Amino acid sequence: MVDSDDDGDRRRDKFARERRDEDYRRGGGGFNRYDNKRPGGRRDDYQVKRSRGDDADDSFDPVSRSGNGSDLPTESDSIYSGPLQTFKKFLTSQEDDISEEDAIKKYNEYKTEHRKHQLERFFRAHKDEEWFRLKYKPDDAKKLREAHLENVQKRLQVFNELKEQGQFNKFSLDFGDAEAIIRMLDSVVVKLENGTEDELKAVLAQKLEDESLADIKKDENGNGTEQPKEEPEVKQESGATEELEEGAIEDGTEKSSNKVNIHRTCSVFLRNIPPGLTYEELEGLCKKSPGFLRLALTDGIAERKFYRRGWATFKRDINIKEICWALNAHRLRETDLNAIINRDITRRVRTNNGIASHKQVAINDLKLAVKLTVLYDKKIGLFNAADEADADREMDIRMGVDLVAASTNPLIKEVKSLVPHDVLNDISEEEAELLGVSNGGEAPAEKIRFERDDNILKALDLLIVYLRIVHSIDFYNHGHYAQEDSMPNRCGLIHVRGQPPSGVSITTDEDGALVVPQKFVNDFISGFNSRIEKGLIEKQYVSEEELEKMGKKDGEKEVEAFIQKNTVELAKDKWLCPLSGKKFKGPEFIRKHLQSKHEDKLEEARAEADFFNNYLADAQRPVDCEPKQAPRDDHRGGGGGERGGYGRERDDDRGPGGGGRNSFGGGGYDRRPQFPPRHSLGGRGGGGRYFEDAPRRQPVSYRDLDAPDDIP
């Protein structure tokens, strides 16, 4: 029995999709040989399931509820709750006689409102998560910037110390100097870890083990002579591994403890950190293990429901396996951390294309390095930008102020003294047109001689090392290691120039000098500039008009709305403040009460508006991933293929095609177990016919082999 006609309709509509017209085609209906064994009418005895709101999917938001207590969302909310509707689907909710112009206008308005609602929903869902607060909340973001500035100033001090000692004059950023480059990186790490001079000397005296050094030896000795030397080393290592497995761990530990390992660490990679888990909670767990140094956490990853990843760093002389097991034995927020041992970096010096040593390429790279240096000095607030406010520095960058001319970094002046005056001067577009060096000028030569200018490369190397040490920018990899000070390797690797280019198009002239195609050089410069621009320089800004469209909030209006929310009229000359529970004679008394007794709440409302506006102002703001649309199946009656065959998931059976809700493609509500997919059977269609939509084999051709050749 049902209480009303509406409930009866809802009950009948529950399995409406199982009684499609398509299910009754070809005389099969929704029945198959399994359905005949089930008593009819059994389905109607089941209790009707409670409806579920459309927005109660795998998002972070609760089910929308209307004012009458129903679980169904209101009409105004449901249109913005799910994914963005297509124009065709949007038109189904409009009047039939709507004009094309009005339809496009309303659809654009719908898209704007949908985007605004989605951003608001995302903000409410994630505003209490730590990674989101550190990124956009004014107070937390300020603390993070101050900590970053402190780390950069420490790195600048280390750079100046090594420069005064002449450490950067011992090598060039070429792959052949890999050993000296690794020594320099180790020196940086020791000083960042506040190591003493004795520890630094001990580290520099140790033998280096790196794959880049092995590659250099192979190039020097040849492939044939190096292989016999490697075999006994491998056997010795395998023997050492066997001893460790048999229980001789203490010997290895004693040997490693005699070395100075201040520049080396062990680390654990945490693959599964819930978004609600804080840094302090995870750090407290890691501190229970001996030798803990630091912890690094990433931002929430949209593709993983904003779970984070992390690296816990420990001293080198501890048993990292036991620590990893201990971390996996704990569950935080009912979640396994899935910790694994992080592998060491085995190749600390990596190569870029050797054409980077060519003079024309080096001049281009030098200009880019100068631009990056002054830009990141300005961003972080070094030298003359130290006394400027964050907003003023950002405005100068956005307005395109000449940062090179305004920079007081002494390194820029030193670089200018190392190269000719005209090398760093960019000519204007008008001057380029007059000189004929623009696109319309004389065509360049097909091939040019490979030329190397040591003075330009020396100036370039100084800037690249500065960027790598101070700002954690790997120039030749066009990458910024933003969290390097919290990572296991604080200055782990660097990319340098490789060997001179070789190939079919690279030839030599009569003097034996390399000759390279001009187009190859131009293409390399163009591609490198593009990657540097996109990866390190370019920043997208959101206009004020766009912010207003996305729902930018006014702090004072939010405060006023908070006051109005806490001003409730009970009767004539009787008003209530829900925040404190006190009653007043008029609304003006409540306003004074809130401004005097609850000023912190008003500041929270104002700060919440700034918090939300900071999120909107980020052009690369995180958003929820759009759900992937399932491929449409045009064969609705057959049920074969993906949507009607064996092995279909129960959730997938709700969609069109396949003829019903069971995994066999029949029309009944079947609770039989699902079988593994059997592609050879295709699927069992709604019409009860097997192999209907399965891929068909080529028909066999029957031919009389004894027939004459002229008869087909």
Curated annotation (Swiss-Prot):
Segments crossing the lipid bilayer: none
Biased composition (Polar residues): 65-79
Region (Disordered): 1-80, 214-256, 620-712
Gene Ontology cellular component annotations, sorted alphabetically: nuclear body; nucleoplasm
Residue ranges, compositional bias (Gly residues): 656-668
GO BP: primary miRNA processing
Intrachain disulfide bonds: none
Location of the protein in the cell: Nucleus
Cross-referenced InterPro entries: SE/Ars2, SERRATE/Ars2_C, SERRATE/Ars2_N
Record field: compositional bias (Basic and acidic residues): 8-26, 34-54, 214-236, 621-637, 645-655
A Pfam family reported for this protein in Swiss-Prot or TrEMBL: SERRATE_Ars2_N
Keywords: Nucleus, RNA-mediated gene silencing
Compositional bias annotation for Acidic residues: 240-251
Family: Belongs to the ARS2 family.
Role noted for this protein: Acts as a mediator between the cap-binding complex (CBC) and the primary microRNAs (miRNAs) processing machinery. Contributes to the stability and delivery of capped primary miRNA transcripts to the primary miRNA processing complex, thereby playing a role in RNA-mediated gene silencing (RNAi) by miRNAs.
Protein name: Serrate RNA effector molecule homolog
